[in-house]
Each structure stands twice: as C-alpha cells, then as structure tokens.
C-alpha cells in the first residue's frame, strides 16, 4: 500500500493549494458491497480486500466524495467486467473507476455516470458534470 499512501499524501498536499479537485481514474478497488456483483465470493480477491476498501474509505474521509454514489444508490452499476465467462453480457462486474470530487465541489455535482455502452476495453468511461 506504499503507492496508495504516497498518492494520498500527494493529493492532500495538492489540495492545500488547489482545494477544488476531481481525481478520476481506475482505482482497482470496489468501495462497498453494492459496487461488486458477488461480494461474498470476492471477499478475498484483490480489489475487494478489507485493507483496500479501508484505504479508499480513508481517502474519501480526507475530504472527497464519490460523485457517482453521491447521486446514485442503484445496484448493478459497474465500470469493469472480466473478459471471462461472458461477465459483461451477464453484468457480473465491478465498479472500480471513480470520479472523486473534493469537498468544496460536492454541492456542485449535477450528474455522475458510467458509459456502460462503451466497449473499447474491459472498462467503461466514467464522467461527472458540475454546475457553478
């Protein structure tokens, strides 16, 4: 977790000079059970390990909001599917791609989405719209 801890430290320092941040990307971690198709069978799989989930929880608690879950509590909303076992067609996915918004921007979130129709990769693009 050295990289993740150093990343969080870097973002904390960056936030001091630039408080309005959106940190987007593939975190390779499902935060909550709602973010993975089978939390029971995957509880010991990298990407859903307790220590990984604790790290993303700490990151969010440092002043960030998961823009997608801020507005959407629907299950079965994923951004990644394995190429194996027809996972995408059966929607057996994971939500591991995030647009995390710093606290000062939280109330500006208008929409956050996953473009599940995009099929260029095993991941789908995620996006967030802010209003000012």
Regions from the language model: what does each represent?
Residues 3-92, 96:
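Metal-dependent phosphoesterases centered on the DNase I-like endonuclease/exonuclease/phosphatase
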Residues 35, 110, 122:
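Short acidic, gly/pro-rich beta-turn/loop elements at beta-sheet edges
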Residues 69, 111-114:
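Hydrophobic/anchoring residues in structured secondary elements
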Residues 100:
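Hydrophobic alpha-helical positions that pack around
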Residues 105-108:
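Short helix-loop capping/hinge motifs at secondary-structure junctions, enriched
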Residues 113-132:
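Surface polyanion/phosphate-binding segment centered on an Asp-His-Pro turn
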């Amino acid at each position: 977790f050295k990289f993740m801890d150093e990343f969080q430290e870097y973002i904390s320092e960056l936030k001091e000079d630039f408080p309005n941040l959106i940190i987007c990307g593939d975190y390779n971690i499902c935060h909550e059970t709602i973010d993975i198709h089978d939390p029971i069978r995957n509880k010991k799989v990298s990407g859903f390990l307790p220590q990984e989930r604790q790290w993303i929880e700490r990151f969010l608690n440092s002043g960030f909001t998961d823009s997608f879950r801020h507005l959407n509590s629907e299950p079965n909303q994923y951004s990644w599917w394995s190429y194996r076992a027809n996972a995408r067609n059966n929607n057996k996915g994971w939500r591991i791609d995030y647009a995390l918004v710093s606290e000062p921007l939280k109330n500006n979130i208008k929409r956050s989405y996953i473009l599940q129709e995009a099929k260029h990769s095993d991941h789908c693009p995620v996006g967030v719209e802010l209003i000012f």
